[in-house]
Structure formats: structure tokens, C-alpha cells
Amino acid sequence: MTQAQIQPVKLGTQGFEVSKLGFGCMGLTGAYNDPLQEQDGISVIKYAFSKGITFFDTADVYGANANELLVGKALKQLPREKIQIATKFGIASRGFPDMKIEGSPEYVRSCCETGLKRLDVEYIDLYYQHRVDTSVPIEETVGELKKLVEEGKVKYIGLSEASPDTIRRAHAIHPITAVQIEWSLWTRDIEEEIVPLCRELGIGIVPYSPLGRGFFGGKGVVENVPTNSSLKAHPRFQAENLDKNKNIYERIEGLAKKHQATPAQLALAWVLQQGEDVVPIPGTTKIKNLDQNIGALAVKLSEKDLREIFEAVPIGDVAGGRYYNGLDHFSWKYANTPPKDSKIST
């Protein structure tokens, strides 16, 4: 397959330009696999940039702050003005089966200040609310983000796993540039409400886990899930469900051969070609996987191809929920906030 060129695209309608394929940095400090050594993690980021990826995604909670620090160190070896850094705030603690979500104005500002220090930058290109605090009116959270934009500390604002009502209300306070949300061949529940709303409002869509948390790359099928991986607790990777889901992988594998692509490339190409406003952020710790992901840009799919791939993964055939057990209430479907001028006491 010919080497794919990564074109710049506009994310949202405020002028934010990013590479059509982004890179999710979470796994570099450990999540589905062991964390990489610091220099190895920096090398992966630098390699991605050398191949044309300029849009890098991190968060304060990844690796308990280590991820932002790692990205910041990599940035020191790259031209800052050519890179777009997205980071996130909002998950105050990451317990299991519960997380503490915080969206007060004071918390927003505190996280931004510490994020700037960890990344060692003067501004954050895209700052997301990682999860919605359902006890704080979204107008208060976004109101503080708007101030950070006015102060030059943040360039663009995003939301992650936000409900339609929350997106609309947030956008009325300050333009939302991007919504980051799970979207892949086996997670398509955003297509009825979230995608049309984002397009109505001119908001870009940043799919996370576009390869189904590695499933379409063969994780759990052609390679074992590491014993210390968080995927061990994920419903779709549980033994009985995984056995059923292997049928889905085999179908995509068959279609991939027709397109001279790997299953991962076909699955990622399907996401990439959902629209110009769609910028997925697959992550990996391996250079060969990164090269494969970039190769997905060279897989050209017709409307008929896209439909055939879509129909090869009937959502009713997917065994297991998309969210870890006990964490469903943190998904976009439950991410409404109280009316403005009211708060839920906690």
C-alpha cells in the first residue's frame, strides 16, 4: 500500500487546524499495556510527528499526571508552533468502580494552571472537560473556560462524553470546537443524536478508541490481553463475550483482505471516512502499529464499501457493554447538568 499523506483539516468552525489523524498518548504511561520507559514514549511521539501527525491527546488523569509530563518533555524536542496539544480536566480521582468528577470554576482554573506547568507550555490548544460534573450547571464550567480563552491560556474548548443538552448549552456560552467521544465499528450509539447535533452546531468530532480499545487490531483475538491490562475488566473482553466477538473480528478480517488492508486499517478507515469533521485519535505503544494506523488513510472506501463494513458489525451481535461495569453512569447518556443558577448539593 502506498504511503499515506496526513492532510490538515479544520476541527470545528473556529479555525482550529489539526492533522486528519491524531495520536492518543494515554497508553504511553500505561493503561491497556505496561507503561513505556520515558525515552521510548518520547520517541513514539517524535516518530508520529515525523510522519505528519501534529495533534496529540493527553489528560491530567492519565498515568496520574505522568502523561502530561511525558508529552511536555517530548514537546521540548519538537516545534511547538506546529503541534496541537489537547488535554483534559474533570476526573478528580479515578477509583473503581467510581470516579470523582469535578467541574467547579475554581477546579477548572486550578487544573489549567497545573496542566500548563506539567506540559511546560504557555497555552493549551484544546482543553476538554473530560467528564461532565452533573452537579454543576455547564454554564459555570464553560464560563470559566471562556475566561481562560480570553486570558490566552487556552485556545479552544472541548467536551468529552457530554449529552446533547449539555453540548447545546455549553456552545451557547462559548463556541465548542470539538466533542471527544467513543466511536468505532462496535460502538455507534452517538450516530443518532450526537453526530447530527455536532454538525448542526459546527463542532468537530474526535473519536476515542476508534479501534475498539485494540480489538480490531487483534487484541484478545490474535494476541492475548496482558494480565495487568485494564481490559481484563472490560465487558467486551470477558471470556464468554470475547468468544462471541471474535466472529466480528473474523468478518472484518475477511473484508480487509478485499481492500489489501489489515483489520485495524479497515476499521480505522471506516471511522476516518465518516466525515471531514471526524479526527480519530488511536493510540499505541508500538511503531509498527502506528505505521499501520497511518496506512489507514490510504484505504479508500466507497459508499457501498462503508455500508458493507457497517453491516458486517450489527450492534446486536456485539457481546458486552462499551463501558466498564459500574461506570455506565459516566457516559454521555447521563451527562446532563442542573439548570443555570441552581446546584445539586453533594
UniProtKB/Swiss-Prot annotation:
Where in the body, by tissue, does this protein show up? Expressed in roots. Detected in leaves, stems and mature nodules.
Per UniProt, substrate binds at: H130
EC number annotated for this UniProt entry: 1.1.1.-
Residues noted as binding NADP(+) in the record, renumbered to the chain: S209, P210, L211, G212, R213, G214, F215, F216, G217, G218
Q: What induces it?
A: Not induced by auxin. Up-regulated in leaves by ethylene and salt stress. Down-regulated by abscisic acid.
| InterPro entries membership | Aldo-Keto_reductase, NADP_OxRdtase_dom, NADP_OxRdtase_dom_sf
Q: Supply the alphabetized keyword list.
A: NADP, Oxidoreductase
Protein task: May interfere with the nodulation process and inhibits nodule development.
Query: What PANTHER family does the database record attribute to this sequence?
Result: AFLATOXIN B1 ALDEHYDE REDUCTASE, ALDO-KETO REDUCTASE 1-RELATED
Q: Which family does it belong to?
A: Belongs to the aldo/keto reductase 13 family.
Under which name does UniProt file this protein? Answer: Probable aldo-keto reductase 1
Organism name: Glycine max
Q: Which gene encodes it?
A: AKR1
